[in-house]
Amino acid sequence: MSEPPAIKPADAALRAPGLLRAVWVRIKEHRMVQWTLAYLAVAYTLLHGAELLGNSLSWPHTALRLFTLLLILGVPVVITLAWYHGARGHGRLSATEIMVIAILLAVGGVLIWRDTATHRAAEAERAAAAEESPGTAAPAASIAVLPFADLSQAGDQAYFSDGVAEEILNDLSHVSGLKVASRTSSFQFRNTDIGIPEIARKLGVRHILEGSVRKAGDTVRISAQLIDAASDQHLWAQTFDRPLTTANLFGIQDEIATDIVQQLTSAIGTAGAAVGRPALPEADTASLDVYDLYLKGHALFLARTKPNLSEAARLLRAAVDQDPKFARAWESLAAVLVISRFWGLTEEQDYVRAAIQAADQALRLDPGLSLPYAVRGIAQANLIALGQEGSWQEALAQLSEALTRDPRNASAYLWRSGTYFNLGYLDRARQDAERCLDADAAYELCRRTLALVELCAGRTDAALRLYEAGMARGYVNADVYFAPVAAARGDRLGLLGILSQQYRAKPQLLQSLYRSLTDPAFGPQERKEALPLIDRQHDDPEAAMGGYWLLKDYDQIAGVVNDSVAVIWSRSDPEWLKSAARKSLIERWRMPAYWRAQGFPPQCKPLGRADFTCP
């Protein structure tokens, strides 16, 4: 059998135009060009109209971007439809074709969602970076103290090395004319691969102090290096080897602080801002064991979780039992106790009064402390939340006294902001939350408090920017109040994310709350079945209060013991704003009496001598 003749390249080239002509004939036969041009004309008109409407109604940029992506996605769909149905007499779609189009749209929708989610995450990161990154060069008289490395053989002394770094930071923070980055801001760069210049840029400082601590038997070695971030050069370095005693520890810390100030003064020169001298405290306990207990307890308080707080209270109680004159141990114990009741700890029934007693003892030993005054203040507000005798006037007076003694006390700003927020003074609450972030830019609870205040004040876009910045850092708290906003904007994925933060352990409740916000068919019977899933005695108070609120069982809200009543000022539920339960909650928190004495917040007003309204 003979082989067929081979096709020469020249023959193939001659056939190609015939193939192209055949394809062009099919394209014309199916009127694909007409379909595509018609679609592009309609799409252009729609896009232009959407742009005009968006500008007049101040739509977010992402809405126009999403609409554009949808129109682009329609091009291949139109071409496909034209191929199969452009010829005359082929106007109906089969079930298979409808399914294919649905799959294409679904895939396109997923791609658009991923693009939009990535865009939103990037926006949140940019917002976070904008808050972290100063717009001008860092002042020469500025420094951040990074967490000192734990070089102990067992590697279990991080709390101790952190304590050494924090003591030095505290010494430097009281030096006049010197800007010192907060502990929270600086310590977030623990074990990071970011270079010193970049860390300094993010913190808005010119100089970085880093170091290490090694405990070995009865001796301690502390090394420290001062770095000029602008040149990435070491300005000063020193290693201290001493017997391990509290007097020596404080002596080393004081030497480092003094040397740092001297080096900065020399580096800044006569043209720079004047830098004062560090006020060097004396060792306030002679017992190394007691100091070790204090450092462990204090570290657990700063990294607070429910188990951490219980252990922190135990360690700090042991410290004050062994040295009743250790003022800072009493101070930290007071701070642990005052927040424990609202973190769900129940081992001791009267945490708040125990906190007041510890704060009083700390001030008897050292009247110059700031935090005990803040504890006294927030304790008064907490007593009101518990239905006991407390005073709003005393709460605010004590918190203000704390800030008089230490204007950089971020916790005092946070607690005073929360107190103003509970009372409905949203402008004052916003100012203190902003001051808290000025004092400690990495204090995420301050950022979330500010987001809630902005939300309740009707500044929704600003609130969402702050909320997303916190979420980008992994912060979770009071998310439930943002759920109705996501639902109203049609952001179902965002809604699920918000609800999951507080209800992931109860998937059935999560599903019910999601449906209550998205499904018009979600009715009274389903609400009734969902309510028992909330345990107001053991659930997170914010989650329990928010769950009742979303399910519209307003009468149950007052039964939740919580240190915050942000729910009172949330404006996303018109029924709640007019409810008797809301007014009753305001009265239970004894706000009207304070308002009549000190002035009503702008959104409320008196009605005669005994009544009020807060529409």
Residue ranges and their predicted role:
Residues 1-122, 233:
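An N-terminal, helix-rich hydrophobic module
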Residues 108-134, 162, 166-315:
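Catalytic-center loop of serine/cysteine hydrolases
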Residues 290, 327-328, 370-371, 410-411, ...:
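Helix-start (N-cap) detector for alpha-helical repeat units in TPR-like alpha-solenoids
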Residues 308-314, 343-361, 384-401, 422-435, ...:
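Structural signature of tandem alpha-helical TPR/SEL1-like repeats
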Residues 320-321, 360-364, 400-404, 435-438, ...:
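Conserved structural position within tetratricopeptide repeats
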Residues 399, 412, 417, 426-615:
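Alpha-helical protein-protein interaction modules
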